[in-house]
């Protein structure tokens, strides 16, 4: 990731995305946008991990309902990489409250407001610092992978061919 515009960010497909069967549709959106999944797993977030993740919200009125929500069923956690990944993913996710999220955003299309709670299907890191902290909460370094996507060479402006790109990325040696 020598290019400073290339970032990694954490995404959580929350329990409602999992139990509603929305995982594939949501993951597909990130891939279609050109983001590369470098780590992904399904986990059941326990209370201890949830409290670490949402520590900045401790003491706020929505803290306990948030912890209950994120620990209610399995989640999919993933790390994606790409140019300006943090802001791209945040924009794709949409406003936190589904009623404020634009149609076409993930929360605008799939989030639910059921009166006493909102189910917004996705978490996305909000800054480089948060992304680093959150990635380290959920992934060990050996669970994140460097690889070349087949189409990367096409967009790589310095390479004149796929072979030149792959050679520069050391992909053929792996």
Swiss-Prot record:
Transmembrane segments: none annotated. SMART domains: NDK. CDD domains: NDPk_I (cd04413). Its main location: cytoplasm. Keywords: ATP-binding, Cytoplasm, Kinase, Magnesium, Metal-binding, Nucleotide metabolism, Nucleotide-binding, Phosphoprotein, Transferase. GO terms for molecular function: ATP binding; metal ion binding; nucleoside diphosphate kinase activity. It catalyses: a 2'-deoxyribonucleoside 5'-diphosphate + ATP = a 2'-deoxyribonucleoside 5'-triphosphate + ADP; a ribonucleoside 5'-diphosphate + ATP = a ribonucleoside 5'-triphosphate + ADP. The active site is at residue 123. Its cofactor is Mg(2+). Disulfide bonds: none annotated. It is found in: Cytoplasm. It is an enzyme of class 2 (transferase). Pfam families: NDK. ATP binds at residues 14, 62, 90, 96, 107. Its EC number is 2.7.4.6. GO terms for cellular component: cytoplasm. GO terms for biological process: CTP biosynthetic process; GTP biosynthetic process; UTP biosynthetic process. Major role in the synthesis of nucleoside triphosphates other than ATP. The ATP gamma phosphate is transferred to the NDP beta phosphate via a ping-pong mechanism, using a phosphorylated active-site intermediate. Belongs to the NDK family. This is Nucleoside diphosphate kinase. It comes from Thermococcus kodakarensis (strain ATCC BAA-918 / JCM 12380 / KOD1) (Pyrococcus kodakaraensis (strain KOD1)). The gene is ndk.
């Amino acid at each position: 990731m020598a290019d400073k515009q290339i970032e990694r960010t954490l995404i959580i497909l929350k329990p409602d995305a999992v139990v509603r069967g929305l995982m594939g549709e949501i993951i597909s959106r990130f891939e279609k946008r050109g983001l590369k999944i470098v780590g992904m797993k399904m986990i059941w977030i326990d209370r201890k991990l949830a409290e670490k993740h949402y520590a900045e919200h401790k003491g706020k009125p929505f803290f306990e309902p948030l912890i209950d929500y994120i620990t209610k069923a399995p989640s999919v956690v993933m790390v994606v990489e790409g140019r300006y990944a943090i802001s791209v993913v945040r924009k794709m996710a949409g406003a936190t409250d589904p009623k404020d999220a634009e149609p076409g955003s993930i929360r605008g299309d799939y989030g639910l407001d059921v009166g006493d709670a909102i189910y917004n299907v996705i978490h996305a890191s909000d800054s480089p610092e948060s992304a680093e902290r959150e990635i380290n909460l959920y992934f060990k370094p050996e669970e994140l992978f460097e690889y070349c996507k087949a189409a990367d060479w096409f967009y790589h402006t310095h390479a004149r061919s796929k072979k030149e790109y792959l050679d520069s990325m050391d992909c053929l040696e792996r």
